[in-house]
Amino acid sequence: KTEGESTDNKIAAAGPNAVPVDTRVVVNIPAFRMDLFQDGKLIKSYKIGIGYPEFPLPQGLRKAQSIIFNPPWTPPDSPWVATMKDVSPGELVEAGSKLNPLGPIKIPIGAPSLIHGGKPASKIGRFASHGCVGLTNAQVKDFAKLLAQASSTEVSDQAIASFLQDKTRTRVVKLHQAVPVELRYETIVVEDGKLHIFKDVYSQNTNTEENLRKVLDAQGVSFEDFSVAEKEKVLAALNAMSVHPKKVVDTKTSAKNVETKSTKNAKGENVVEIGSVTLKGYPAPVNLDTGNGTSVVAARTDKNR
């Protein structure tokens, strides 16, 4: 078992769209979003880059146990490495090198995945990595600081600045308390009173009516109680975000649905307002760091428990 892997299912949040009651990191892959909770309160949200479909982010429960400043990089024996110039599988790339893609900080969360910097803002909210959570350098510095605080780890701003100043020297800070990292794949999310349906980016066929009913049941809401108009709107949103969306044809000319090509754009989200889910669900982002130097403050904060 490598650093960051967890076999303790007792600390896994239960049910779809579960809101943590402890200190943990929650990554929802299709939403391109990472949240840091401290004692059940959402502290901050980040837009992220995710693994390409060929190198997807794994799912399940991991742990963050250390923060590594100025990490070196050992390229894996993988075809994508062969396409890089001046880099060979297994040959160490030193900290601070322009050939090192990890940026100033990495946080191991169990092989083969990391949370790390080094991504340009243009890669945030997109496929951007080979099985890792990708952040900009500014994002990862901010996240590392908050993660240390949330884990009761004593490391001052001055110490962090000192670590980062010498880009060629690697420093490892062990977290005082390991922090669970939950990697979710939820394309249907009841969030702050709205139904969010995200594109099925890894083609796992999750945008189905059956899955929708499970998500609603977890919130104490029945799909049968939706109005006809609400049902049509939600099912249309599910279809649009599915792996193989179908185009609804005028029933006067055809009684069937015909299949159309799925968009190649990884990004996608439909938001449907449903009266029966008001004040229910997962919290809206808090101070969402979009990676472009701006933060989006949540419209509601009373849900961020």
Residue ranges and their predicted role:
Residues K1-R305:
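N-terminal pre-domains immediately preceding structured catalytic cores
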